[in-house]
A protein has these predicted regions:
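Active-site nucleotide/adenylate-binding loops and adjacent lid/helix of ATP-dependent enzymes
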Residues: 16-53, 58-105, 111-174
Length: 174
């Protein structure tokens, strides 16, 4: 199923229900430019919308703006509001510097590969957070290749071969 079409009650494992008495949280999405996300079918947009619909604050953080200052993760971030029915589905607020451990409750790493130096440095910066809940865990993001991780569950997937050798791939596909 495409997550963008999944009923909200099926998303409880990602975004727990919040009652009116529950504290409102600040979610920071560390990701490639939010304007480039497809508005239909993007799991990142679905999670942003769910957080917003539940009354939480949603921030967009460009990984290039992350920094560590005196042992604290900080970043320029901008609040966003989503209205997917509008001609302008993303409205940005004022950009300002946020101290992650003091102002951000949950940070979601949604940066797409390639796993290059910039990706690794941004991930390592996120690992400095001590109070902020960081999803996906930075050490795991670096340690496990997202494509190769699935091979640890071979009994749950079709026959798969990972190789750089073209002759092996051709033989496998035959």
């Amino acid at each position: 199923r495409v997550w963008g079409r999944m009923p909200a009650d099926r998303l409880e494992f990602i975004m727990p229900a919040v009652s009116s008495a529950s504290p409102k949280l600040t979610f920071a999405f560390v990701m490639d430019p939010v304007e480039n996300e497809p508005m239909d079918g993007s799991t990142t947009i679905v999670m942003m919308r769910e957080a917003q619909d539940r009354g939480h604050t949603v921030l967009y953080v460009d990984p290039d703006d992350l920094e560590v200052d005196a042992g604290r993760v900080r970043s320029l971030a901008v609040s966003i509001t989503l209205d997917l029915a509008s001609e302008t589905p993303i409205t940005k607020g004022e950009a300002r510097i946020y101290d992650f451990d003091e102002e951000i409750d949950v940070a979601l790493q949604r940066k797409d590969p390639p796993v290059d130096r910039d990706f690794i440095v941004a991930t390592q910066i996120m690992d400095v957070c001590r109070k902020t809940i960081v999803l996906n865990r930075p050490a795991a993001v670096i340690a496990y290749n997202e494509k190769l991780l699935a091979t640890q569950f071979a009994d749950l997937m079709p026959a798969t071969r990972v190789t750089r050798r073209i002759d092996e791939l051709k033989a496998f596909m035959a």
